[in-house]
Each structure stands twice: as C-alpha cells, then as structure tokens.
Design a protein with these regions (language model features):
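Bacterial N-terminal signal peptides that target proteins for export
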Residues: 1-10
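Bacterial lipoprotein signal-peptidase II cleavage site
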Residues: 6, 20-42
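Hydrophobic core
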Residues: 15-19
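Charged, low-complexity C-terminal accessory regions
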Residues: 25-28, 51-72, 194-230
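Short, charged N-terminal beta->alpha structural module
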Residues: 71-98
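Short, electropositive alpha-helical surface patch
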Residues: 170-192
Length: 230
C-alpha cells in the first residue's frame, strides 16, 4: 500500500512537470516576433539610384523647381517653334497666349524666319502624325532643325528647350530631336515625368545650364511668366 502511494506521488509530480514545460513552450510560440527596422533615408536613396530612376523634385505642393541656377526673364522678341512636330507645341502656344506673351509662332520655322529674334523657345518631341500633317519626313525635320539651330548660334539667339510631353515624348526619334536642341540650349523647361532616367537633369548638370522641372503641363504657366517677363 505504501509502495503504491509513492508511485502515485511520482506520477503526479511527473504530470505537473510536463504541464509546466508545455505551458512554457506555448508561451514561446505565441510571442510576436521582433520586426526589422524600416530602411533609412540613405538606404532608400541608394535603392532609387540602383533602380535607375532619377530623384523626383516636383509634386502638387511643389509645382515647379529650377536646378543649376535661377529661372529668369529672357530677352525679347520671342519666337516659338517645334522640332519633331508633336502637339506639344500647340499646347505651349496656348499657354503663351494665356500668360499674355508677345511672340511669333510657326511650328515649321526656318532660319530665315528668325531675323531680329532674341529668344527661341523650341518644343521638342516626335510625332509621326504631326510630321505627316506638315508634309515632311523625320530627316527633313532634322535638316530644318540643324539649319535653324546653327543660325541661332551664329546670331547669338538664345535657345530654350521645352519638353512638355512627359514619357510619351521619349523614345528613339523623340530623343534624337531633343539631343539636337539640347546642344544649343541655354535653358530647359520640362514636365518632370519625361526625366525618369535623369537624362535631362544629367545634361543640364554637365553643361551647367538651368533646368526647370514642372509637375504637369498646367504648371508651366508661372515659369513662362518669368521667362517672358509677365
């Protein structure tokens, strides 16, 4: 009898010990794991650089930003034309009218049209439809642009490049037209979406010319007022 009592006590102790161990194990499995800290600002910047995307400067709250200097008033008379014959030049024409600018507009202007002009604003961006409507080929457009740009250089006419079509005005032909104009430009105004790869900000930095980035086409109003002195 005494022996059976001892066995019962030992079994009770063993069961109690097992319950304690099980409880401890359950507690460990229900504890929330420690979360890893989020990326630091430096890590985020490094990720953006590795992804190949340029830093974003504009937003709804900051509609335009000028890098590499200040946006300023340029000398008149002004002339507005296109290289690439996209519809962007028509939108820029409407914006120029809206700010009350005094200027001459001809999307297919030739060098001979620029007599006495001091500042040329060139809307860049290729459009096969626009080229077709103008009755000219891409090669014809390049030849016209080259002649016009050389005339500007020889006669001290300031060239401002306007790239307002965003990503839709990027691509092989559009970039070829843009590259032609960039080499003669004293300033750039562009919708920032078209600079996702940093092409234009990198160029402006290398050449040390001001580039004004705008959030949307509508945000071009204030920069244009400054450029034309309105």
């Amino acid at each position: 009898m005494k022996r059976n009592k001892i066995v019962s006590i030992l079994l009770l102790v063993a069961m109690t010990f097992s319950i304690v161990l099980t409880g401890c194990g359950d507690k460990k499995t229900t504890e929330a794991p420690t979360s890893s800290p989020g990326p630091t600002t430096q890590e985020t910047s490094a990720t953006n650089e590795q992804s190949g995307k340029a830093t974003r400067y504009t937003s709804k709250e900051t509609p335009f930003v000028t890098l590499n200097g200040e946006l300023k008033k340029y000398e008149s008379p002004f002339y507005l034309t296109s290289v690439g014959q996209s519809a962007d030049v028509s939108m820029l024409d409407a914006l120029m009218k809206k700010v009350g600018a005094e200027y001459t507009y001809n999307a297919t202007a030739k060098a001979s049209d620029l007599k006495d002009v001091k500042t040329v604003i060139i809307a860049t961006g290729a459009s096969s439809k626009g080229l077709g409507a103008a009755g000219i080929s891409a090669e014809d457009e390049k030849a016209r642009a080259s002649e016009l740009l050389e005339y500007c250089k020889e006669n001290d006419i300031t060239v401002i490049m306007a790239h307002l079509g965003g990503v839709s005005r990027r691509g092989k032909l559009s970039d070829e037209f843009a590259d032609m104009v960039l080499e003669y430009s004293s300033g750039i105004v562009m919708v920032e979406d078209g600079n996702d790869d940093g092409k234009f900000t990198d160029f402006a930095s290398r050449k040390n010319i001001p580039i004004t980035l705008i959030n949307t086409i509508a945000d071009c109003i204030e920069p244009l007022k400054i450029i034309v002195g309105k």
